[in-house]
């Protein structure tokens, strides 16, 4: 298996490729401002200036927000550590006197992730036994290059040798908006015969003594650690390929955002199912509001 870091260095950055493709498409359209009447153009110029002032304030807000989040992330640290110790059985809670063989909270992270709709789609039945060995998931911000990093901690297991699997997201600022530049995942060192992402099939050939081998790719949660790769030749990336790669990266980033913003900070609620009920309630509340709006519209009509 190739080293993801080497691949990312040798290949063009996907975000640049997509930007070039989109730029080419944008040039085909008429400039909206040039098509406006002079008096309307003056008004729009003022609106653009207002928007510019707004964007400056928003940039300051995002900067202060990032600093505040970083500060509270440090405060959360001891709580996450204690949570991890209880889940893994390193720390027993006060008041427990009965000796039991079962330590900690079995299948804690697996059950929590399966209760989330986005992550449940990524977890296949063949993944579950391996994910039972998952002890903890942590994330942290990185500054050089800018982005964030996940660490998945596993007990010793029969599937792979790694004790820690990592996934790092490198971000760039584009018009004050963070955009994914690339993602780098750990190369998983699978134990022979236990790889969950692919299998090498061997078939005897009747025409020669050399057997024919074929690699069968499997859907698996552990593909999360093998981000989408960019073709070596940018010229071969047509519009459809660029769109497909963009969709893959967006899906990958959705998974990362779910882990970072929902699962890690509120994993207990996802384990118990409380978070699922909260999300369902929120969706119902939005649907009810939309129904009310439709009723008002019907009455007005």
Swiss-Prot record:
Gene3D superfamilies for the chain: 1.20.5.1500, Nucleosome assembly protein
Residues in coiled coil: 15-69
InterPro entries on file: NAP-like_sf (IPR037231), NAP_family (IPR002164)
Keyword Coiled coil included in the entry's annotation: yes
Domain statement: The acidic domain is probably involved in the interaction with histones.
Protein task: May modulate chromatin structure by regulation of nucleosome assembly/disassembly.
Protein name as annotated: Nucleosome assembly protein 1;3
Source organism of this protein record: Oryza sativa subsp. japonica (Rice)
């Amino acid at each position: 298996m190739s080293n993801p870091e080497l691949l990312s260095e040798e290949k063009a950055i996907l975000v640049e490729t997509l930007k070039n493709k989109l730029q080419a498409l944008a040039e085909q359209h008429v400039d909206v401002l040039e098509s406006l009447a002079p008096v309307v153009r003056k008004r729009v110029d003022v609106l653009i200036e207002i928007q510019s002032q707004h964007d400056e304030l928003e940039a300051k807000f995002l900067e202060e927000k990032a600093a505040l989040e970083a500060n509270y992330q440090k405060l959360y640290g001891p709580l996450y550590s204690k949570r991890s110790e209880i889940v893994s059985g390193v720390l027993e809670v006060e008041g427990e006197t009965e000796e039991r063989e079962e330590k900690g909270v079995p299948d804690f992270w697996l059950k929590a992730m399966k209760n989330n709709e986005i992550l449940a789609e990524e977890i296949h039945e063949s993944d579950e036994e391996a994910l039972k060995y998952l002890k903890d998931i942590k994330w942290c911000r990185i500054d050089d290059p800018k982005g964030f990093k996940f660490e998945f901690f596993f007990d010793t297991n029969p599937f792979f040798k790694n004790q820690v699997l990592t996934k790092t997201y490198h971000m760039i600022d584009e018009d004050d908006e963070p955009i994914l530049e690339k993602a780098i995942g750990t190369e998983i060192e699978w134990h022979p015969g236990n790889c969950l992402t692919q299998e090498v099939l061997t078939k005897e050939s009747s025409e020669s003594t050399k057997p024919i081998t074929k690699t069968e790719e499997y859907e698996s949660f552990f593909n999360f650690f093998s981000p989408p790769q960019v073709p070596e030749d940018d010229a071969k990336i047509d519009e459809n390929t660029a769109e497909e790669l963009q969709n893959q990266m967006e899906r990958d980033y959705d998974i990362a955002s779910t882990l970072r913003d929902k699962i890690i900070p509120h994993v207990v609620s996802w384990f118990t199912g409380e978070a699922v009920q909260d999300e369902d309630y929120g969706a119902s509340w939005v649907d009810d509001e939309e129904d009310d709006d439709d009723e008002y519209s019907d009455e007005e009509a």
